Amino acid sequence: MASVNVDFEQAGELKIGQVGIANLRVRTLDVSRLVQEMRERVTRAPKLFGRAAVILDFGGLSQVPDLATAKALLEGLRDAGVLPVALAYGTSEIDLLSQQLGVPLLAKFRAQYEPTAVSPPPPPPPPPARAEPAPPAARPAPGRMQRTAVRSGQQLYAENCDLTVLSTVGAGAEVIADGSIHIYGTLRGRALAGAQGNPDARIFCRDFHAELVAIAGHYKVLDDVPMDLRGKAVQVWLEQDQIKIAALD
């Protein structure tokens, strides 16, 4: 199976959220690189990224940027065509920075680098308890099925389950699932699987022309997909934080 894998390090990793807000996790505090990368994204997919709301996540940095640098980044991103609207919730320093910038914090995109205090050693484990029979496994949530076409401007979300679409997903439409997505018609809009961060979710489609596909926030737009995969039956999955696409034999 032919697959697609882009192997390069970007200054900022952009993830797509299920609420239509993108999360820019800053890896390298290089304002010019971050702005140029965002400008290129907007140029490649203006309908997707033009004037898109963006959350800035500084959790991948060892030090929070100073106020002047953060202001320069926000201004540069606005000039690149997106709208930075908040910071990802994180440390007390990020809280202070958000106040100085006059932007809110969003806990949904929680930063993950707050230094942890040295914790005391854990208490000794309790003596083993008498073995009890395991409770019956919980039944998985039933998947959601959409029998009719998802038209431009519509959004369909399958919470805590897979999504099956028996018809087409039109351009400008969006289908989202916390699990995997199966599309038996043409996919011309956007499909976002693993919306709550499940990296094992997949997307299956019989006729692939997607504007965008995303798994656990990692995404790929149509312009980045080889021509020989367009119009084919494909599967999409995540491998080492990279979106891969392959034809179904």
Curated annotation (Swiss-Prot):
The gene is minC. One of its GO terms (biological process) is division septum assembly. Keywords: Cell cycle, Cell division, Septation. Residues 115-144 are annotated as: Disordered. PANTHER family: SEPTUM SITE-DETERMINING PROTEIN MINC. This is Probable septum site-determining protein MinC. It comes from the Bacteria. Interacts with MinD and FtsZ. It holds the Pfam family MinC_C. Residues 118-139 have a biased composition (Pro residues). Cell division inhibitor that blocks the formation of polar Z ring septums. Rapidly oscillates between the poles of the cell to destabilize FtsZ filaments that have formed before they mature into polar Z rings. Prevents FtsZ polymerization.
